């Protein structure tokens, strides 16, 4: 089924509704590839600026769909936060999972660009891909610390029922209840990692990231100086 895109005018009219009716001035665009249509996204930013809408907003997108012109225009329109999927540092793991990724040097450059514009960044990472090992997961955690985004979120690779990828994992699924599909609980028998291994890596990822002095200094101490 072909997706149906809303017009920029329709989006701006809804923003105006929330501003005038309820005094809302902060928004999240719940579209995982918000800027995939560069021209349309640029025109939306320009329309928000033209209408003088005093708002702040968050987007989610792939770093590949951002450049300086578009990012700076979105920032001018009110973008202050971006969620982007980094997923893994291991290109072989991403290839096996059929996940597209930028070259790591380009990824670093895009995040530095956003940081330079004053946009806060959330990096999203996945542990426990089918070909992941303990070593590849630890490398991803270290890479996340190197990128040092404002927020990092780590989750377990989860093939959800009803998705195409679920079919290839169907014979290995161990989850018996839908509530187990929560991106924290491993739901299939992994060849390289036990369920306890994956849970331990996930806990270590959060502890290692948020107790890291580099992150703590950037996000807390510098704001007090």
Regions found by a protein language model. Give the residues of each.
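Active-site glycine- and acidic-residue-rich loops that bind
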Residues: 131-137
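Generic detection of long, well-ordered alpha-helical segments
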Residues: 8, 38, 134, 194-199
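C-terminal accessory regions of radical SAM enzymes
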Residues: 138, 142-154, 158-225
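Radical SAM [4Fe-4S] cluster-binding motif and immediate context
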Residues: 1-122, 129, 142
């Amino acid at each position: 089924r072909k997706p149906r895109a809303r017009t920029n005018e329709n989006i701006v009219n809804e923003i105006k509704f929330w501003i005038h009716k309820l005094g809302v001035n902060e928004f999240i665009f719940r579209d995982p590839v918000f800027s995939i249509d560069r021209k349309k996204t640029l025109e939306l930013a320009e329309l928000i600026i033209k209408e003088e809408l005093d708002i702040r907003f968050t987007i989610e997108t792939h770093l590949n769909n951002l450049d300086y012109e578009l990012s700076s225009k979105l920032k001018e329109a009110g973008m202050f936060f971006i969620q982007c999927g980094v997923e893994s540092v291991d290109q072989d793991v991403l290839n096996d999972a059929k996940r597209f990724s930028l070259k790591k040097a380009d990824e670093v450059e895009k995040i530095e660009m956003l940081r330079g514009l004053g946009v806060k960044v959330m990096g999203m990472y996945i542990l426990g891909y089918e070909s992941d090992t303990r070593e590849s997961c630890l490398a991803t955690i270290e890479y996340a610390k190197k990128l040092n985004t404002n927020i990092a979120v780590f989750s377990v690779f989860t093939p959800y029922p009803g998705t195409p990828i679920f079919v290839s994992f169907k014979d290995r699924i161990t989850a018996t209840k839908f509530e187990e599909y929560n991106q924290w609980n491993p739901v299939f028998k992994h060849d390289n990692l036990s369920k306890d291994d994956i849970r331990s890596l996930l806990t270590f990822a959060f502890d290692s990231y948020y107790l890291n002095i580099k992150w703590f200094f950037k996000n807390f101490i510098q704001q007090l100086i």
